[in-house]
Amino acid sequence: MTKQPSLRVNAAALAAGAILLAAGACQKPQYSEGLYAEVATNKGLVVLSLEFEKTPMTAANFVGLAEGTVENAAFPLGRPYFDGVEWHRVVPGHVIQCGIPKSETAKDPGFQFPNEIVLPDLNHGRAGMVNMANGGPHTNGSQWCITLGDRSYLDGDYTVFGQVVEGMDIVMSIAQGDVVQTVKIIRVGKKAKAFKPTTESFKAMVEEAKVRVDQAEADKKAKEEDLVKANWPDAVEGEGGVKYATLKTGQGKPPLPGGTVKAAYSGRAPLAGKSFVSTSEGGKPYWGETPAPFDFIVGTTKVNPAVDASLASMKKGEKRLLIVPAAQGYKTSGFYATQRPGEKRFVISPNTFLVYEIETLDVRPPATK
């Protein structure tokens, strides 16, 4: 079932969208109380409502860069950061993305800051939501996106900090290479007028957020360790922090480089409480690239580092349980499957530890030329 957008988000968007256009084409729009960004593009004007009270750190980054009040590696203080940036990534039905500065000294702000997730209030459940792009958890910089549809599967991994309240037709018309000409910040009301980020205030927010993130990661690690001890107390730790237990011994020798292993496996994400693949069940619940026992060619086929290393060392008939830390699995990038019409997109979130059961059904020597 497709996740429905939060009603609270929609209500906020409607309130923010109370933009009253004054009579006469030459007069400027008037806004209800709030913080806005007028994004002038070569296609026309897009107006964003920024959630500076719910996501103050992320809004401070955007506003501080837009107005040149936060130090960065690309430009000196006072220089608007986003003026002239291109929409360098446009994926129909997904997002438009920009934020790489037109600078000869740097292609990013020279800093990163943590995620600021506010669910269910701020989600990706509809077109027009504004979020931060990143290269993994807590690596936000200056690149940001506008959704072009329901992208609910992004919830929890990317910070939503605003929404489009005017110019969605312009957003839908943006093509790769189109340009953000200027970004003007509009403050209406006492709270918004007091929101004036500086380098010092932004850094203080980031440091406070890092403390929160460090504690959350420590709590998650402790929960993982408790789960492993409770369910797999006999698992032995191997290379890279991967733990394993032999469920069934095999015969013969492991495959040679270039050899072929006929393998079956199942995988699950214990903390999320979900299974994501099982070759014995035709690939269910996710019909991935390996819906049945498959040929794994040592040194060529790639699943993830832990699975690859295990299959390369297993004998015919051997079955293992693998407990895979994120660093040996899908790391900070996670796994985003190809979306199928009418289905919720399958996702393994970044920094997720996984458990596999792997069985070697057959081992064959390298093919001769």
Role assignments for model-derived ranges:
Residues M1-P5, A22-P29:
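Basic/polar N-terminal segments that are highly enriched at the extreme N-terminus
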Residues T2-L14:
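Bacterial N-terminal signal peptides that target proteins for export
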Residues A13-A22:
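Bacterial N-terminal signal peptides
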Residues G24-K369:
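Cross-family detector of peptidyl-prolyl cis-trans isomerase
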